[in-house]
Amino acid sequence: MANYTGANVITAGDVTKYQPDAFGFGIASTDTEAVNFFAQTTNDILRQLRVEWWQTYKTNIFTDITILNTAEMVDTKVNLDQFERAGVYLFLGRFLCPALTKFRPETEKDRFERMGEFYMSEYNKEWRTILEDGVEYDETGDGTIQVSEREPLHGFRRLTR
């Protein structure tokens, strides 16, 4: 089932599939801090989509050039299920691990700094792969993704040289 609900990209269960002990270091999955991290992960993914992908999509899809500057991405039309792995990596790398680290510049990096760097690297790879494969955006709002509604970053309809 595709996630068009506007709910968060990931849940605590998704995180523990990739890092089973993630919530065993002092921040529980139900803590306000973790709940805020889940919401911020979703917001960051949607913002990055608007910045990196939406311009290509609307240029390739909308034929009426008068609406190109006014067309906004509708968050609930993005299938967030395709961002689960990227969301977990972003949650761990940008939010959870930095919240747990000691950040002592005079010493070696601690476990959480190294984990944060690893997960951000994995996030960047996963993000690129999703954009190259094609973002699922339900333009018609019918709850299904047609071939024409899956737009890669480079665009199918663009001449590439």
Q: Predicted segment positions?
A:
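Elongated alpha-helical scaffolds
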Residues: 81-95
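Short loop/turn elements at secondary-structure junctions
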Residues: 4-6, 27-28, 93-161
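Short, low-complexity intrinsically disordered segments
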Residues: 51-52, 81, 101, 125
